[in-house]
């Protein structure tokens, strides 16, 4: 269990993009995060993990639609993951994960003050400070979102001198909005289905102090995405040298 206080000391009031009749705003956002989690094993082959977080505090309302005022924040997020260990020479494992973060139906943006919470209403949009696996190519903010992920990884050549430490894996993710009419990272319709994604990766420790990492993700937009429906691609090639 944990508690974390986020106190906003930012005094900047200027809008990044001034709007007609509006050049500044109050961006105060002060919340307390209360979380509880658990992890462990179920027998020899199953691992589990779970976490639930509540975000409680105060925010400033959207300055565009009405005069700003202070509103309450009450938002939630959670994660559940289960892993099956095959116990083979390839160290193969399969994973399933579900994530959710609440959204707010009167927000136009899931995280910003501008186009944010409507004055006089409870802000239910979760504002994440941690990491959640929301894909390589899509990778939206963890707010007004629920996802399902299935993945598998293995070391395919355990007897090879050169490729003994090569791990390969794949994840398939499905993305949906929690609030169909709520704001999101990008322009969306009132549909809930954001899309799906396939991520492939390889981690190869060539020597004790040098490793290569490859990542590729492709996101297929769903019916909720208002922009172009072309597939989005992400490629990463990284090298790590340890001293």
Model-derived features: positions:
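Signature for the C-terminal beta-barrel architecture of outer-membrane proteins
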Residues: 1-108, 150, 155, 172-176, ...
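Repeated loop/turn-to-beta-strand initiation elements of outer-membrane beta-barrel proteins
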Residues: 44-48, 90-94, 159-161, 166-168, ...
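Short glycine/threonine-rich loop-to-helix capping motif typified by GTGT followed
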Residues: 66-67, 182, 226
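C-terminal structural cap/anchor segments
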Residues: 92-188, 192-193, 197
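Membrane-proximal extracellular juxtamembrane segment immediately upstream
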Residues: 206, 210, 214-224, 229, ...
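Outer-membrane beta-barrel "beta-signal"
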Residues: 231-243
């Amino acid at each position: 269990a944990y508690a974390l206080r986020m106190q906003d000391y930012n005094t900047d009031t200027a809008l990044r993009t001034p709007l007609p009749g509006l050049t500044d705003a109050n961006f105060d956002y002060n919340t307390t995060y209360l979380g509880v989690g658990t992890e462990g094993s179920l027998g020899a082959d199953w691992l589990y993990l779970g976490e639930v977080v509540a975000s409680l505090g105060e925010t400033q309302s959207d300055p565009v639609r009405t005069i700003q005022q202070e509103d309450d924040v009450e938002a939630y997020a959670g994660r559940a993951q289960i892993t099956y260990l095959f116990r083979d020479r390839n160290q193969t494992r399969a994973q399933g994960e579900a994530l959710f973060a609440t959204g707010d139906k009167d927000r136009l943006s899931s995280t910003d003050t501008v186009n944010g919470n409507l004055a006089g209403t409870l802000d239910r949009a979760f504002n994440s400070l941690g990491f959640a696996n929301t894909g390589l190519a899509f990778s939206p903010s963890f707010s007004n979102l629920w996802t399902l992920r299935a993945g598998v990884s293995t070391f395919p050549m355990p007897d090879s001198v050169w490729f003994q430490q090569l791990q390969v894996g794949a994840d398939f993710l499905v993305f949906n909005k929690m609030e169909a009419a709520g704001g999101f990272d990008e322009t969306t319709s009132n549909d809930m289905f954001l899309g799906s994604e396939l991520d492939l990766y390889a981690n190869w420790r060539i020597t004790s102090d040098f490793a290569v990492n490859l990542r590729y993700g492709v996101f297929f937009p769903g019916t909720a995405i208002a922009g172009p429906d072309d597939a989005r691609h992400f490629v990463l090639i990284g090298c790590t040298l340890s001293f």
